[in-house]
Amino acid sequence: MTLSSSGSASDMSGQTVLSADDADIDVVGEGDEALDKDSECESPVGHHDEVDALGGKEIPRSPSGSSTDAEGKGESQQQQQEGIQNKPKNSVVKPPYSYIALITMSILQSPQKKLTLSGICEFISSRFPYYREKFPAWQNSIRHNLSLNDCFIKIPREPGNPGKGNYWTLDPQSEDMFDNGSFLRRRKRFKRQQQDTLREQTALMMQSFGAYSLASPYGRHYGLHPAAYTHPAALQYPYIPPVGPMLPPAVPLLPSSELTRKAFSSQLSPSLQLQLSSLSSTAASIIKSEPSSRPSFSIENIIGVSAASSVAPQTFLRPPVTVQSALMSHQPLVLSRSTAAIGPILSVPTNLISGQFLPTAATAVAKWPAQ
């Protein structure tokens, strides 16, 4: 046992000595195997085999590839930002003018100093790119400013001028509406002054409501000059409206010459004043002596042929045309004893009796002369 062990030990020592001495000697097959191993390590097939052997887990490589990808992305983003900055900015800005200033510009530049709504919008669109892009969103604003501001006047289109829409122009009194001719600053809101003639006509129209209303034959239409109508004093018998408080019945009439001469005068001649005073005293005594029972109003009481009369009849001048047309008869007219029979026909308001009619009732039993 000792010999074999010693012999084996000597053999092993000899092999080790030889291998150490002949380290540079190429052993048969060792070099080729080493080359094959190196090639297998470098080949991708061997790499995949190693991945399979490790259970599908790939050995992580160096982060050199990911860093290059991040650098590429950063460069592309920088290029995009530079491209955006190099693009020209939008130069369309809203003009600093109000709609009133824009309308005034367009009207002043026109040869006739008047434009339609479409012409105003066309001028604004051609002059300002901002409104050209926003059209027609602002067209209603132009229309409202034209209608609501007194500085713009609407002119109807002429019959021989075909087209659509009315013309608009500037009020001559609104020339100094902008400060120093600058359209950027407006002094104050322009308000058109009401004309004096218009105010006078409005006052006359309001006063004419009532007795002399617009519906009456003597009513004056609004807008016409008062001189176009004949004054009531020029008529033979002024018009008496059927309104107002009533006077005592059976008012005697004055001569037509006196009515014409003293149509609206508050004073009468001395002779007429004496006549009126005597008639008033006579009428007062007659009214006191009248019986309390009065007959009803009827045509027989007005147009009667009875000659019986308690008081001597008193004649007067011919009645107005209105009474003559109502009583078309050639027979003599005899008034009734009742004062209420003739009252509604000859009653007039108190505001028209000055200088025209007597203030008291004096013809309770008067008779008109035959025609």
Curated annotation (Swiss-Prot):
Residues 297-303 are annotated as: tle4-binding. Pfam families: Forkhead (PF00250). GO terms for biological process: anatomical structure morphogenesis; cell differentiation; negative regulation of DNA-templated transcription; negative regulation of neurogenesis; nervous system development; neural crest cell fate commitment; positive regulation of neurogenesis; regulation of transcription by RNA polymerase II. Signal peptide: none annotated. Keywords: Developmental protein, Differentiation, DNA-binding, Neurogenesis, Nucleus, Repressor, Transcription, Transcription regulation. It is found in: Nucleus. Residues 34-51 have a biased composition (Basic and acidic residues). It comes from the Eukaryota. InterPro entries: FH_FOXD3, Fork_head_dom, FOX_domain-containing, TF_fork_head_CS_2, WH-like_DNA-bd_sf, WH_DNA-bd_sf. SMART domains: FH (SM00339). Initially located within the dorsal blastopore lip (Spemann organizer) at the mid-gastrula stage. As expression fades in the neuroectoderm, expression begins in the head mesoderm in two regions at the lateral borders of the presumptive neural plate. These regions correspond to neural crest cells originating from the mesencephalon (anterior) and the rhombencephalon (posterior; rhombomeres 2, 4 and 6). Subsequently expressed within trunk premigratory neural crest cells. Its main location: nucleus. Induction: By dorsal wnt signaling. Inhibited by bmp signaling. Residues 1-90 are annotated as: Disordered. Residues 94-188 bind DNA. One of its GO terms (cellular component) is nucleus. One of its GO terms (molecular function) is DNA binding. Residues 21-33 have a biased composition (Acidic residues). The keyword DNA-binding applies. Residues 1-13, 75-85 have a biased composition (Low complexity). CDD domains: FH_FOXD3 (cd20047). The C-terminus is required for transcriptional repression and mesoderm induction. Interacts with tle4. Transcriptional repressor that is an essential upstream regulator of neural crest determination and mesoderm induction. Functions by recruiting the transcriptional corepressor tle4. Also acts in a negative auto-regulator loop by inhibiting the transcription of its own gene. This is Forkhead box protein D3-B. It comes from Xenopus laevis. The lineage of its organism: Eukaryota, Metazoa, Chordata, Craniata, Vertebrata.
